Amino acid sequence: MALILVLLALALWGGVALAQAPELSAKLAACETGADAKDRFAVFTGSMPREGAAVMAMRFDLHERLPGGRFKRVALANWGVWQSTAKKGVPGFIFTKRVEELAAPAAFRAVVSFRWSDVEGNVVRTAKRTSPICRQPDWRPDLRVGRVVFDEDGRARAIVVNDGRSPSGTFEISMDVRDRSVVRTLPGLPAGQRRTVELGRCSAPGSATVTADPAHAVEEADEGDNAVTVACPVKR
């Protein structure tokens, strides 16, 4: 479940008169991301022209899509409720909402419903618009074994890469050859960096499986690319 806080719901009308009628739209005004939840937020703006109505109203519903899923409505305080104005002399209604501490990885959008009513409270028109998507990428580290090479004596060297957006903590890298296992410990790997690790020897026939973080000490964006199996070299 996403940890989401509503920070601001600000109606913009009155005070400064609008020069012209705003368009009917739902916009993504801002989308910020970051490794910490406190850095992630989105701002959505809905606007509607008056078109002769006595009362203009709009409702924001936040929708979230998790990896591999579909967009689903998120129940939030102060969302999913109608905001309205009957202020005279303004050509339209603009309303802005901000949501903070967005989950990651995930995608968010606002579905904005519009309603026009006459002086007697009768709804004379309705409409709906969907904002562009605010995408929050996965900020976790992503370890993988990039390549395994062998020296002339059959000693393996593995290149370990962190393809993620944040540094990893301490983890192990192992090489399994038949009934033998060699394990090395790395103090961590910064995002976007790689490191060469010297492992044990192996020789044909047989194969070696090199695994980054075999103990799953690091929570990663993708756990499916941590191991590589290669043929052991023929002795010279």
Residue ranges of model-derived segments:
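A beta-strand/beta-hairpin structural motif
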Residues: 78-81, 87-98
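Extracellular acidic, Ser/Thr/Pro-rich low-complexity tracts
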Residues: 48-53, 162-166
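Surface-exposed loop/edge segments in extracytoplasmic proteins
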Residues: 67-78, 179-185
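Short coil-to-beta strand junction motifs in C2/discoidin
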Residues: 54-60, 168-173
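Conserved aromatic beta-strand anchor motif in extracellular beta-sandwich/beta-rich domains
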Residues: 58-66, 175-179
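Bacterial N-terminal signal peptides
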Residues: 3-13
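Extracellular/luminal regions of secreted and cell-surface proteins that mediate adhesion/ECM remodeling
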Residues: 21, 26-35, 85-86, 103-107, ...
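Contiguous beta-strand segments within globular domains
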Residues: 34-47, 53, 152-157
